[in-house]
């Protein structure tokens, strides 16, 4: 036994000398030379020889235990006293130095005792040599000093936050101590340092938030908050572990932004409303950047954005309504005001789309806010006129020759058409818009001979992209009819040149319209003057050569005539409607006619005739003289050709005040809606077979909302009607459930 111990002690004395030399090097003892290769090999060989003897002369266990004791002694006798005597930043520097020394010590000793790692630790499932060294430091040094180190680091971070310069490299190395003592995991860093950092940061920024909120405006506060977040991210990059960033940022965001969100965003003098009011786009962009990463952080901003747009848009509607109800406003003035309103809404939309795109980075929340705001005021009426009609009138105005009021160039017109379509998105009654648009389109195509076909088709293409082919099918059909009408006219002229017997004595142009495409018009059995009868019969003869299956129905209300009025002073070219022309041509054969005589000869209704005679005798151009002279037409009146009439122009257009078609259009749309609701209900029930009342109504609204917002009461009425017509039936056990009857 004595011999055995002597071998172990002799070998260990060699190892102790090597360990002592290494520790002197680490402690920077003057004149201590480094290891030479022979010394390193001697130490390795000593361990090898002690651990490769056959039992009972294998000293692996004893050497392994004494290896661990080396660290315990070094940490207790050298490392801990050196760190304990220092404080604050100096203590941190010593801790960093000792951790660096520990890593060197472990690396060198692991090399000297390498044979243990290769065989002993593996066979016995013992901690590796490196683990033994680091566990010793963790248990003896780190556990005692981590709390003091944490306090010192937090103090330095506080100084840096207050603007002082600190040694960032030192902090990075201290953080490495926390991470390294987790033995490959971050648990020590997270529990012993990070959790306290997050708590301390929350307290720090909570205090700052209270102070900044009292001292600063919303824009200035946001600048400080944004800078704080930037610095905290920079702090992580410089010396904290990367996994800390999302946690630290979340803490700062919570204290600087979430906790004070209501006070900050809704600040009466400088919050979101004020920024929107004063067009502070940079500040709004900053508000977006700050609140975008926070869950639901943008909700109050988007809500205020919506409110602001709604207020501005509603103010425009109110302004237009007041102008429209002004008793001093003329009819033409009202039309101009309507067009001004649409231009204002387009400009408003352009303005806030810039906000959405540039300030709010096209975020869907702000697109939604913009849409909902515009839907509020774009569906209000202006002095009883629906926005659908106003928008249709605006389209009509800019598509007329010369761009109507706005006098737009081609490029500007195309851009304006795109913006009109964007406004149409927000109008609920798109079917009503379609009817008003189609009615006005018909008049443009028929009477605006110099209209731009390209822009007409361009707008319909945009409508189709937005609302589908069904929305534009009739409108496109009208354009096709106008193209075919030119072909018909060319063929008609050729027909007349071949058939010499059919001499008209005047220029006669006919436009053939397809009934299904065009709006419905009132037809009358007007007794045409003989001059017109010949023309009509000639075209009938021509059309009969083209088709036998189609019947022509003449719509005189859409026709125009150019008459040569031979007055005493000069001949004036008079442009009138077909009806007006029929009245005037009666006076070619007589100077005077009574109301009753005109009524009988033309076969017109009282209302229509009164309107015609009023336009010819009571308005600007008094081509007929009425007796007695009054502003109203009576069935006892007599009319005489006014040979004394004259005008400075050689060509005049005698207007026929249009009848108010609004009521009829609305009635037609309501009728079409009933059919649409019926079709949607049947389609849904045919697919679902059995469905509850609430779900059926809900699905019906969803089906139809693209074109109009169906009235719930109307849907219920249509359901009852379908039940009475045996399309649906109520479930006998549950009256709120419907069944489809095939």
From Swiss-Prot:
GO terms of biological process kind: auxin-activated signaling pathway; jasmonic acid mediated signaling pathway; response to auxin; response to jasmonic acid; ubiquitin-dependent protein catabolic process
Q: Does the keyword Ion transport apply?
A: no
What are the GO cellular component annotations?
Answer: chloroplast envelope; SCF ubiquitin ligase complex
What PROSITE patterns has UniProt attached to this entry? Answer: CULLIN_2
Q: Which residues cross the membrane?
A: none
Pfam families assigned: Cullin (PF00888), Cullin_Nedd8 (PF10557)
Specify the Cullin neddylation domain's residue ranges: 672-734
Cited SUPFAM superfamilies: Cullin homology domain, Cullin repeat-like, Winged helix' DNA-binding domain
Query: From the UniProt record, which GO molecular function terms apply?
Result: ubiquitin protein ligase binding
Q: Which InterPro entries match?
A: Cullin (IPR045093), Cullin_homology (IPR016158), Cullin_homology_sf (IPR036317), Cullin_N (IPR001373), Cullin_neddylation_domain (IPR019559), Cullin_repeat-like_dom_sf (IPR016159), WH-like_DNA-bd_sf (IPR036388), WH_DNA-bd_sf (IPR036390)
The protein's UniProt keywords, in alphabetical order, are: Isopeptide bond, Ubl conjugation, Ubl conjugation pathway
Q: Where is this cross-link: Glycyl lysine isopeptide (Lys-Gly) (interchain with G-Cter in NEDD8)?
A: 686
Q: How is it modified after translation?
A: Neddylated; which enhances the ubiquitination activity of E3 ubiquitin-protein ligase complexes.
Function per UniProt: Core component of multiple SCF (SKP1-CUL1-F-box protein) E3 ubiquitin-protein ligase complexes. Involved in ubiquitination and subsequent proteasomal degradation of target proteins.
Q: Which family does it belong to?
A: Belongs to the cullin family.
User: Assembly and partners?
Assistant: Interacts with SKIP17 and FBW2/SKIP18.
Q: Which PANTHER family match?
A: CULLIN
The name this protein carries in UniProt is Cullin-2
- In its UniProt entry, the species of origin is given as Arabidopsis thaliana (Mouse-ear cress)
């Amino acid at each position: 036994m004595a011999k055995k111990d002597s071998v172990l002690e002799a070998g260990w004395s060699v190892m102790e000398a090597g360990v002592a030399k290494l520790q002197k090097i680490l402690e920077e003892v003057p004149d201590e030379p480094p290891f030479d290769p022979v010394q390193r090999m001697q130490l390795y060989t000593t361990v090898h020889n002690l651990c490769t003897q056959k039992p009972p002369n294998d000293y692996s266990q004893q050497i392994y235990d004494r290896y661990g004791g080396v660290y315990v002694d070094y940490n207790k006798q050298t490392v801990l006293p050196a760190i304990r005597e220092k404080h604050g930043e100096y203590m941190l520097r010593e801790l960093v130095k000792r951790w660096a020394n520990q890593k060197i010590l472990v690396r060198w000793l692991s090399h000297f005792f390498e044979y243990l790692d290769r065989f002993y630790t593996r066979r016995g499932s013992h901690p590796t040599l490196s683990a033994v060294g680091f566990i010793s430091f963790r248990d003896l040094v780190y556990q005692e000093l981590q709390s003091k180190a944490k306090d010192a680091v937090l103090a330095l971070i506080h100084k840096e936050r207050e603007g002082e310069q600190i040694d960032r490299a030192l902090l990075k190395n201290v953080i490495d101590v926390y991470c390294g003592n987790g033995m490959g995991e971050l648990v020590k860093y997270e529990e012993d340092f990070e959790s306290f950092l997050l708590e301390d940061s929350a307290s720090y920024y909570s205090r700052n938030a209270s102070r900044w909120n009292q001292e600063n405006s919303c824009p200035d506060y946001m600048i400080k908050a944004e800078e704080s977040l930037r610095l905290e991210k920079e702090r992580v990059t410089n010396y904290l572990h990367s996994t800390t960033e999302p946690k630290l940022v979340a803490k700062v965001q919570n204290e600087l932004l979430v906790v004070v969100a209501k006070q900050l965003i809704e600040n009466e003098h400088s919050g979101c409303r004020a920024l929107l009011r004063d067009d502070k786009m940079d500040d709004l962009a900053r508000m977006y950047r700050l609140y975008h990463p926070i869950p639901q952080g943008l909700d109050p901003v988007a809500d205020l954005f919506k409110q602001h747009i709604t207020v501005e848009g509603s103010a425009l509607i109110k302004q237009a309504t007041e102008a429209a109800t002004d008793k001093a406003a003329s009819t033409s003035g009202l039309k101009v005001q309507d067009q001004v309103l649409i231009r204002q809404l387009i400009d408003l939309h352009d303005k806030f789309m810039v906000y959405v795109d540039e300030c709010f980075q096209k975020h869907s929340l702000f697109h939604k806010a913009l849409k909902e705001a515009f839907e509020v005021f774009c569906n209000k009426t202006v002095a009883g006129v629906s926005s659908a009609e106003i928008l249709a009138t605006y389209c009509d105005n800019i598509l007329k020759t010369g761009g109507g009021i706005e006098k737009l160039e081609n490029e500007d017109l195309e851009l304006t058409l795109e913006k009109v379509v964007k406004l149409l998105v927000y109008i609920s009654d798109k079917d009503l818009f379609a009817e008003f648009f189609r009615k006005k389109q018909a008049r443009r195509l028929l009477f605006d001979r110099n209209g731009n076909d390209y822009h007409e088709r361009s707008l319909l293409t945009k409508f189709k992209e937005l609302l589908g082919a069904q929305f534009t099918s009739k409108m496109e059909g009208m354009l096709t009819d106008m193209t075919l009408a030119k072909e018909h006219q060319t063929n008609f002229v050729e027909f007349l040149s071949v058939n010499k017997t059919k001499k008209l004595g005047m220029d006669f142009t006919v436009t053939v319209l397809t009934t299904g495409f065009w709006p419905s018009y009132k037809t009358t059995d007007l007794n045409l003057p003989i001059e017109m009868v010949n023309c009509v019969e000639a075209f009938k003869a021509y059309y009969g050569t083209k088709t036998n299956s189609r019947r022509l129905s003449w719509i005189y209300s859409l026709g125009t005539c150019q008459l040569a009025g031979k007055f005493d002073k000069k001949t004036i070219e008079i442009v009138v409607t077909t009806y007006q022309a029929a009245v005037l041509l009666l006076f070619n054969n007589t100077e005077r006619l009574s109301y009753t005589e005109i009524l009988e000869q033309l076969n017109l209704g009282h209302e229509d005739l009164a309107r015609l005679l009023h336009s010819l005798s009571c308005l600007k151009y008094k081509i007929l003289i009425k007796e007695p002279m009054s502003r109203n037409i009576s069935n006892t009146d007599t009319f005489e050709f006014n040979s004394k009439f004259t005008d400075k122009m050689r060509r005049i257009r005698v207007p026929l005040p249009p009848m108010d078609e609004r009521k009829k259009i609305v009635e037609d749309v309501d009728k079409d809606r009933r059919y649409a609701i019926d079709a949607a209900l049947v389609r849904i029930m045919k697919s679902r077979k059995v469905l509850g009342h609430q779900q059926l109504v809900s699905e019906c609204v969803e089906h139809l909302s693209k074109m109009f917002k169906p009235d719930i009461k109307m849907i219920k009425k249509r359901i009852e009607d379908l039940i009475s017509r045996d399309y649906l039936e109520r479930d006998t056990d549950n009256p709120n459930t419907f069944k489809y009857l095939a």
